[in-house]
């Protein structure tokens, strides 16, 4: 029904299925419970990223707004984000950075807030496309539902991004794993 590929979840499920096929139901039940625990961690991370995003957008921690302009290396160090990630996020349209006359990028306090949001969502395994979709919706409607924006690809999105419904996918995977756990218990 649904496949969640992140953080080795698929491999764990395959291992559990093989273990069950060998009729080692006790080990298979242990594996499915580990899988469920990891799904719960992933869901918690996804929800936490949404909470952090709401907090940043609500103005909590706006002290960054008064910082002087920073260069890429300074931003990288301040936010513990690699310079490659900053370049990647810029190339993928998540961030548009101003430049000085000499061509150096300069990051504003607003840019830092946006980067904190992107970092939180990426750490929770949201795709670049989901983040871009959410940022676009928020720029048009600051009151937009963050969870819905992250979890609802548009009809124009590619087939790859249709699989980008992280919270929905994790919820479906959890539901399926509980069903499998019940079946394994019955088979035991």
Residue ranges and their predicted role:
Residues 1-71, 109-188:
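Arg/Lys-rich, alpha-helical DNA-contact motif
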Residues 83-103:
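Major-groove DNA-recognition helix of helix-turn-helix-type DNA-binding domains
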Residues 103-109:
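Minor-groove-contacting beta-hairpin "wing" of winged helix-turn-helix DNA-binding domains
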